[in-house]
A protein has these predicted regions:
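Structural signature of alpha-helical solenoid repeat scaffolds
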Residues: 2-5, 20, 34-42, 78, ...
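Alpha-solenoid helical repeat scaffolds
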Residues: 104, 131, 135, 162-166
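Amphipathic alpha-helical scaffolding segments comprising HEAT/armadillo-like alpha-solenoid repeats
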Residues: 9-21, 43-62, 71, 80-94, ...
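Positions within the helices of HEAT/ARM-like alpha-solenoid repeats
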Residues: 25-32, 65-72, 85, 97-101, ...
Length: 191
C-alpha cells in the first residue's frame, strides 16, 4: 500500500479512472486498491501522504462520469477529507444522486462548520438543501445554526419541517422549546 499511496494524486486518479459502470465490468480490484490506499494514509504514521490522496479523490470525483463510482469515491473521501475540501464537497449537495454522499462527507469532516453556516445564510436555498443542512447541523450539534433553523420553519413543507425539528432538538436552545412544543402538540404528544 505504501507504494500505491506514494504515487499521490496522480496514482489515485489513475486507479479511479479504471473504474467502470457496474453493468460493464467488475470494480472490486480497483475499489480494494483505493480503499487500501485511503486506510493507509489515514494511519497517523503515513499522514504525510494524505493530502495528495485527498486531492486525487476530489479530482477523480470531478472527472468520473458514473454516479455509482462517484459515490464510492465520496465514501473514501469522507475518511481522509479536511475542512479545505468542504467547498468542493458542497458543490454536490443539490445533486440528486450524490447529495447524501457529499453530506455524509461534510458531516464527518472536522472543521466544516463555517462552510455549513455560510451555506445556510444563502437566500436561494431549496427545500432539499435546507433538509440537508438541517441534518448536518443536527449531526454536528451546531448551536450556531439555530437562528437559521427557526427562520426556515416558516412556510416549510412537512418533510423539511421534520428535519428542522430534529435539528432543533439536537442543537437548539431555549428559543427552540416553543416551536418544538407546538410541533409536538400537533402530533398529539404531551410534554
Amino acid at each position: 500500500m505504501g507504494e500505491l499511496a506514494a504515487t499521490g494524486s496522480k496514482g489515485v486518479e489513475m486507479i479511479a479512472a479504471m473504474l467502470v459502470p457496474a453493468d460493464k465490468g467488475k470494480n472490486a480490484t480497483f475499489e480494494y486498491a483505493l480503499n487500501g490506499v485511503v486506510a493507509y494514509v489515514t494511519d497517523p504514521a503515513h499522514e504525510a501522504l494524505r493530502d495528495d490522496v485527498r486531492k486525487g479523490l476530489l479530482a477523480a470525483i470531478d472527472r468520473c462520469g458514473d454516479d455509482a463510482n462517484r459515490a464510492f469515491l465520496f465514501s473514501q473521501l469522507q475518511f481522509c477529507s479536511t475542512a479545505a475540501d468542504a467547498a468542493a464537497m458542497a458543490r454536490y449537495l443539490d445533486d440528486p444522486y450524490l447529495a447524501d454522499y457529499a453530506l455524509r462527507a461534510l458531516v464527518s469532516t472536522p472543521g466544516t462548520e463555517a462552510l455549513l453556516l455560510a451555506e445556510a445564510g444563502k437566500d436561494d436555498l431549496t427545500a432539499a438543501r435546507k433538509q440537508a443542512l438541517a441534518y448536518a447541523f443536527a449531526e454536528k450539534r451546531l448551536a450556531a445554526a439555530e437562528p437559521f433553523l427557526l427562520t426556515w420553519l416558516e412556510g416549510a413543507d412537512a418533510q423539511t419541517a421534520e428535519q428542522i425539528y430534529n435539528a432543533l432538538a439536537a442543537c437548539g436552545s431555549q428559543a427552540s422549546v416553543k416551536p418544538l412544543a407546538a410541533a409536538a402538540a400537533k402530533t398529539g404528544c404531551a410534554w
